[in-house]
């Protein structure tokens, strides 16, 4: 594993390879991230993993400040995987002096679900993802289906900007109780964590088919 803070150093390593996989992350890596990276390793000659907590996608400075960070542990996890190229930029490297959200034509989709609760969030995500895609020109870029609204919008961004990259959606990796793995799970207290696990159990229960006999019994 090799870690770089400058994208120019990485470009020198990958500009002549047949296929490059990119896995954008905000760090605090867990098994969900590692599953994306393993898939990228199986499908590409070189794999770049970016670790950058993007300030443009946060709606408050407190939320940004609280986001879990553990770069030392992250790099150790990458070291254990394979020949990973880690990109660990600071704000100046990523945005220079132009630290502004780009506005995308995502339409009404940004005004529902997470977009409704976090105005401007997806423009912030799109800004950093587009920068990473243009920096490294990867063959494939990997994102979890856990953030399905984000995944759909990134695919829309790629079409809108006419970027030549294959966006790969990867299945959600879950905890033992069914909760989707997330870096933010670390911010939950015991009561909140238990409640989160209970919600997914209720959702799974609701998906179970109701038998015809059961319906007849309640007529």
Language-model features, listed with the residues they occupy:
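Positively charged, low-complexity intrinsically disordered leader regions
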Residues: 1-18
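Di-metal (Zn2+ and/or Mg2+/Mn2+) metal-binding site signature of metallo-dependent hydrolases
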Residues: 26-40, 150
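Residue-level signal for inorganic ion chemistry
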Residues: 30, 78, 143, 178
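ATP-dependent adenylation/pyrophosphate-handling site
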Residues: 41-62
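Divalent-metal (Mg2+/Mn2+/Ca2+)-assisted nucleotide/phosphate chemistry catalytic cores
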Residues: 65-140
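Internal alpha/beta domain cores that form substrate/cofactor-binding pockets in large enzymes
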Residues: 116-136, 141, 149-170, 176
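Conserved phosphate-binding loops in nucleotide/dinucleotide-binding enzymes
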Residues: 174-202
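Conserved small/polar residues in nucleotide/adenosyl-binding loops
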Residues: 213-219
């Amino acid at each position: 594993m090799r870690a770089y803070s400058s994208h120019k150093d990485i470009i020198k390593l990958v500009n002549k390879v047949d296929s490059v996989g990119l896995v954008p992350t905000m760090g605090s890596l867990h098994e969900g991230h590692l599953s994306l990276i393993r898939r990228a390793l199986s499908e590409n000659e070189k794999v770049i993993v970016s670790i950058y907590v993007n300030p443009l996608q946060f709606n408050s400075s407190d939320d940004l400040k609280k986001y879990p960070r553990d770069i030392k542990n992250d790099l150790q996890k990458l070291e254990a995987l394979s020949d990973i190229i880690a990109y660990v930029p600071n704000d100046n490297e990523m945005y220079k002096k132009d630290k502004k959200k780009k506005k995308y034509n995502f339409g009404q989709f940004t005004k529902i679900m997470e977009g409704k609760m976090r105005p401007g969030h997806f423009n912030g995500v799109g800004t950093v993802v587009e920068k990473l895609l243009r920096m490294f020109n990867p063959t494939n870029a990997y994102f979890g289906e856990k953030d399905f609204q984000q995944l759909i919008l990134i695919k829309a961004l790629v079409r809108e900007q006419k970027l030549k990259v294959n966006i790969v959606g990867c299945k959600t990796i879950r905890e033992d109780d069914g909760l989707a793995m997330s870096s933010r799970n670390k911010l939950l207290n015991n009561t909140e964590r238990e409640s989160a696990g209970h919600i997914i159990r209720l959702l799974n229960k609701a998906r179970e088919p109701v038998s015809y006999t059961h319906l007849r019994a309640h007529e």
